[in-house]
């Protein structure tokens, strides 16, 4: 059988490491022509134990002779900007919260972005607000992709210069993506379903957890991601939300990403997270947590939501926080908010 090595990425996933190498080759096939050997300066604000940073920055782009600028503490926005000042950056690998945090900082706009030709996003949903803020400051479009630790990580990525905003692009070379229903059968055209992946970048399984591996692999060896997606008319993949984060209100499916997108489009809302909490009447209710840039009233934000959302999707409670809970890479932790109070 396969020899399984243990690497130190989150949740102890096993791989023969060929999947990481395969993903490097796949990513270079998608974006490599954008990079001149030995001439690129790539900003990597994510820790190298995170598979996104490891495969894309440390392995794929480093193999092109790129200089990788590491940011030890991306939460320190002032320090982050100071680190960037001596560099004429050509590429940036980030996530949604970083694009917003940097883009709203007045000192960031003073940096030289004349050579910045590729901004990559992954790890968490990218909001339209983040795209607008980033492009307004840097002049650069954010190119979004999608992946997981189990897929080393990249499954799909937009073609630079041909981005379909709001999607994570088409699957990489030698990668198959299926959208499945609850019975692991393909959904119809235009319907949403669980994203399942088959390709050389997919893991062998969870380390010493054959029972958990069996839960996520189909009979024909597709890995079930736990994410809900849909195809656009062009065949690009659009992420709807995490299956486990979906909220069911009176039998209706509510996706937090959709509501967070509306909330962050409010000019005074910086970040938003939406979760479902138990409700005696409706099963679950929609609860929102936001950070703001100005002194605004919750009632005003609720009214803003009512203008753009069907009633059952409007948050029944909105709480303003100083800061949203985040992981070490800046990903908003909905589960902590779900357990809050």
Set out the residue ranges of the language-model regions.
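Short, exposed "boundary/linker" segments that immediately precede the start
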Residues: 1-7
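Conserved AMP-binding A3 loop
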Residues: 8-25
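Conserved AMP-binding/adenylation subdomain of ANL enzymes
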Residues: 21-41, 51-90, 105
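Gly/Ser/Thr-rich phosphate-binding loop
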Residues: 66, 86-94, 103-164, 176
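AMP-binding/adenylate-forming catalytic core of the ANL superfamily
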Residues: 92, 198-199, 204-205, 212-215, ...
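Active-site glycine-centered loops adjacent to acidic/histidine catalytic or metal-binding residues
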Residues: 123, 147, 169, 184, ...
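Beta-strand->loop->alpha-helix junctions that form or flank phosphate-binding loops
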Residues: 143-150, 169-171, 275-277, 319
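Conserved ATP/PPi-binding loop(s) of AMP-dependent carboxylate-activating enzymes
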Residues: 170-174, 183-216, 254
């Amino acid at each position: 059988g396969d020899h399984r090595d243990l690497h130190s990425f989150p949740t102890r996933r096993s791989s023969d490491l060929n999947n990481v190498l395969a993903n490097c080759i796949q990513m270079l096939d998608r974006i490599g022509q954008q990079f001149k050997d030995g001439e690129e300066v790539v900003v990597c604000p994510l820790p190298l134990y995170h598979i996104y940073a490891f495969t894309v920055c440390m392995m794929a782009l480093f193999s092109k002779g790129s200089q990788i600028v590491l940011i030890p503490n991306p939460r320190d926005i002032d320090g982050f900007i100071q680190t960037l000042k001596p560099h004429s950056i050509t590429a940036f690998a980030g996530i949604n919260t970083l694009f917003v945090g940097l883009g709203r900082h007045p000192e960031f706009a003073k940096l030289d972005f004349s050579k910045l030709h590729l901004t990559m996003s992954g790890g968490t949903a990218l909001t339209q607000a983040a795209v607008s803020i980033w492009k307004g400051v840097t002049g650069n479009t954010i190119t979004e992709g999608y992946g997981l630790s189990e897929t080393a990580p990249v499954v799909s990525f937009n073609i630079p210069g041909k981005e379909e905003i709001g999607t994570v692009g088409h699957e990489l070379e030698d990668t198959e993506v299926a959208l499945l229903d609850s019975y692991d059968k393909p959904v119809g055209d235009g319907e949403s379903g669980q994203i399942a992946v088959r390709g050389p970048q997919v893991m062998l399984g969870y380390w010493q957890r054959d029972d958990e591996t069996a839960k996520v692999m189909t009979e024909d060896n597709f890995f079930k991601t736990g994410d809900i997606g849909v195809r656009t008319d062009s065949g690009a993949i659009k992420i709807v939300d995490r299956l486990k984060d979906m909220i069911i209100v009176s039998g209706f499916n509510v996706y937090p990403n959709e509501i967070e997108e509306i909330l962050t489009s409010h000019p005074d809302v910086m970040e938003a997270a939406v979760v479902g909490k138990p409700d005696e009447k409706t099963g679950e209710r929609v609860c929102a947590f936001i950070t703001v840039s100005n002194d605004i009233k919750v009632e005003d934000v609720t009214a803003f939501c009512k203008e753009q959302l069907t009633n059952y999707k409007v948050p029944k409670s909105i709480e303003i926080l100083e800061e949203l809970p985040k992981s070490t890479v800046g990903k908003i932790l909905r589960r902590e908010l779900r357990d809050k109070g």
